[in-house]
């Protein structure tokens, strides 16, 4: 099913009782990129993880909880295998930190070491994280495509030579599958592009084509990005997916080309969707 036999996925493991950064398992990004990208990366971006089950003890032994947000840069050398991150976070449950900031710094240092890049960590109070929203643009899910297939097929993407305003399209129908366990991964995928006009029905068909595909969230988004870039003479492109949570974690990869409006990107990633 995959060559990720060295990960925790699909294996019975014992939950840790003590803080252990060694639980984190990196997976080199180059494993997937070598088949998609030649030369310099055509994108930049970030993988935004949300940790809903995060707790530790203070110096008196009192438990604290938070929602954690981890920003892993797309140019880091590795992604972090999700089950290993879950077990790492559970290893914090009985560990004592003198302050909340000490806990944040420890998590940031451990994740940065595992990812091979500087990971930004923010800890939110539970009552400050009720930010459910919607994505901007047009949902294509009410349209009908001429054909549906269930393995990724870039030839499904169609463009028309009618340059116009910047497009924003999204679909709630993205489904991919874990490359180790085969478990389904559900997501909403959003694209923003300028240059040639992307035919919305073709984007719908392309999104559906991932339904039988097995790969990690980050790799799926990068494939969508490279297929869109290859299919049309686009001036700018951004691809963003918000995956539903599993094991108390969700992963939300964002990839974009060129210069993007920082304020617009901040507004885009600041909201989670209802399924999360």
UniProtKB/Swiss-Prot annotation:
Compartment list: Cytoplasm
Which UniProt keywords are present, listed alphabetically? Cytoplasm, NADP, Oxidoreductase, Queuosine biosynthesis
> What domain of life does the native source organism fall in?
Bacteria
GO terms for MF? preQ1 synthase activity
Say where the protein is mainly found: cytoplasm
EC identifiers of the protein: 1.7.1.13
Residues that bind NADPH: 82-83, 246-247
Gene Ontology CC terms, in alphabetical order: cytoplasm
Q: Where is the active site?
A: 178 (thioimide intermediate), 185 (proton donor)
Q: Pathway membership of this protein?
A: tRNA modification; tRNA-queuosine biosynthesis
GO BP of this protein: queuosine biosynthetic process; tRNA modification
Positions annotated to bind substrate:
80-82, 217-218
As its record notes, the protein acts as a catalyst of: 7-aminomethyl-7-carbaguanine + 2 NADP(+) = 7-cyano-7-deazaguanine + 2 NADPH + 3 H(+)
Give any Pfam family that matches. QueF
Q: Return the InterPro entries for the record.
A: GTP-CH-I_C/QueF, NADPH_dep_7-cyano-7-deazaG_red, QueF, QueF_N, QueF_type2
| Subunit details | Homodimer.
| Family annotation (PANTHER family) | NADPH-DEPENDENT 7-CYANO-7-DEAZAGUANINE REDUCTASE
Q: Which family does it belong to?
A: Belongs to the GTP cyclohydrolase I family. QueF type 2 subfamily.
Q: What does this protein do?
A: Catalyzes the NADPH-dependent reduction of 7-cyano-7-deazaguanine (preQ0) to 7-aminomethyl-7-deazaguanine (preQ1).
Q: What is this protein called?
A: NADPH-dependent 7-cyano-7-deazaguanine reductase
Which species? Teredinibacter turnerae (strain ATCC 39867 / T7901)
């Amino acid at each position: 099913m995959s060559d990720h036999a060295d990960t925790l996925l699909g294996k019975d493991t014992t939950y840790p009782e003590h803080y252990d950064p060694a639980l984190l398992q990196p997976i080199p990004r180059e494993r997937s990129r070598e088949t998609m990208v030649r030369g310099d990366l055509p994108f930049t971006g970030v993988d935004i993880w949300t940790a809903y089950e995060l707790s530790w003890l203070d110096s008196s032994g009192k438990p604290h909880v938070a929602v954690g947000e981890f920003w892993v840069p797309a140019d880091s050398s590795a992604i972090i295998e999700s089950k290993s991150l879950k077990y790492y976070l559970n290893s914090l449950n009985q560990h004592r930190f003198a302050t909340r900031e000490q806990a944040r710094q420890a998590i940031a240092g451990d994740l940065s070491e595992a990812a091979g890049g500087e990971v930004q960590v923010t800890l939110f109070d539970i009552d400050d994280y009720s930010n459910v929203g919607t994505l901007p643009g047009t949902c294509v899910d009410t349209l009908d495509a001429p054909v549906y297939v269930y393995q990724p097929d870039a030839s499904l993407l169609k463009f028309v030579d009618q340059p116009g305003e910047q497009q924003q399209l999204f679909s709630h129908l993205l489904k991919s599958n874990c490359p180790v366990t085969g478990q389904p991964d559900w997501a909403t995928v959003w694209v923003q592009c300028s240059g040639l006009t992307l035919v919305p029905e073709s984007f719908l068909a392309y999104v559906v084509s991932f339904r039988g595909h097995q790969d990690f969230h980050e790799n799926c988004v990068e494939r969508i990005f490279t297929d869109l870039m290859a299919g049309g003479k686009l001036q700018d492109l951004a691809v963003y997916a918000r995956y539903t949570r599993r094991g108390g974690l969700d992963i939300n990869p964002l990839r974009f080309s060129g210069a993007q409006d920082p304020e617009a990107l901040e507004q885009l990633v600041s909201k989670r969707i209802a399924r999360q």
